[in-house]
Amino acid sequence: MLTFNSFNLAILISNFFWPLVRILAFFSTAPIFNDQNVNKKVKIILSFLIAFLIKPFLPKVNVELFSIIGLFLLFQQILIGIALGLTCQFLFAAFTLSGEIIALQIGLSFANFFNSNRYIGTSLISRWLNILNLLFFLTLNVHLYLVFMLIDSFYKIPVDVNFLSANIFFIFLKFSSNIFLNGVMFALPIMIFFLISTLIMSILNRLSPQISIFSIGFPLNLLIGILILYYLMSMSFPFFKSLVNQLISFIFYTFLKI
């Protein structure tokens, strides 16, 4: 005869609840999904749907939800979801850094937009690069890759496996430094040009005091900076694809094998 008691019910609920927590934590930090314009009800319904579909294929965890081990697993699922989402945010952070550097060099750092997601002001160039980044993100279906990686994480890092280790922080630090290095490299042509331009204008100003840096240098820097930025646009899509490949390689071959 089939017996079903409160312990079995608690195990059944917990096996659905822990994947749901990881998915919700991921959607709260991952790009596109954490946007203020995405309805919270849509994110919750999508999380419940994914958790319901993958639950029959996940290994059973015989741990009660309201126990010390259960609370530890709950904290661990939140940590894994947030870590996956924040790792994906590096794609947009690299372009944001490039835009801030370019805007500072051109002289457009004073032109700011309010970012409703981060509650801070971002420069005009950063906003423009982020819009391009968003278009590339959707064109390449990266959001679907992220959902696939999230589902795959339940097989590579099961719910009852200890995820916490001393190497996690250093692994993320190394990867984030590599992503931000790429962001600086994207803005490097403009940085080098304006370094040379400032040096030349300084020498000309010393040789001929009639040449004013403020009346000639700033408009010239703005004009040439926009022309170089137009040239960089042809490189932005290959640059984004390179970042996506680095992100996918890191998640599949490093993060999910910790």
From Swiss-Prot:
Cellular component per GO, a single term: plasma membrane
Subcellular location: Cell membrane; Bacterial flagellum basal body
Transmembrane segments: 7-29, 44-58, 65-87, 91-113, 129-151, 182-204, 211-233
Entries under InterPro entries matching the protein: FliR, T3SS_IM_R
Chief localisation class: membrane
Keyword Lyase: no
GO biological process: one example: protein targeting
Membrane topology: Multi-pass membrane protein
Alphabetically ordered keywords of this record: Bacterial flagellum, Cell membrane, Membrane, Transmembrane, Transmembrane helix
NCBIfam families in UniProt: fliR (TIGR01400)
PANTHER family per the UniProt record, alphabetical: FLAGELLAR BIOSYNTHETIC PROTEIN FLIR (PTHR30065:SF8)
Family classification: Belongs to the FliR/MopE/SpaR family.
Known function: Role in flagellar biosynthesis.
Protein name: Flagellar biosynthetic protein FliR
Species name: Buchnera aphidicola subsp. Schizaphis graminum (strain Sg)
Lineage: Bacteria, Pseudomonadati, Pseudomonadota, Gammaproteobacteria, Enterobacterales
Gene coding for it: fliR
